[in-house]
């Protein structure tokens, strides 16, 4: 795989100490450099931080027939905001409609839908709401809900929603499990796996 830098962070397992976004002209230059050199099979976005960067990604990717996986990174584990308010609006209105898969956790899904999500019925409503923005698939990660297990709910257009359950990992020493999960989905899609298979196999890394 390869990457395009959208922002730099000064952080550790305790929190984020600084965020330094890439310039608006650097991101498309870097993205085009990667696209021109590699036959990309899938692309994942992570922390985009501001609206300019979101709109840059949209302007490039909307003309490409490359599966786009959006991990809507908004809030760091320690509580720091990783996506500005205008960027959140741009992500919802412009990036998600051109995405293939979106992988919000519960707080991110609440921001994107404007709903309070505490029950299975509310998760179902949120998933359907997000699918209606134009994506093929939404994975709502349930790790923020109470319970012994972390339960993710998968919505694929035209199919019945299903759940994936794993033992909850309790640790203060690591973060980034959501990013790892979305990266694994991207890798499986890049291998040519169907959406459902790609998501299930990506989740198996956490069992």
Residue ranges and their predicted role:
Residues 111, 171-195, 199:
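Short, small-residue alpha-helix embedded
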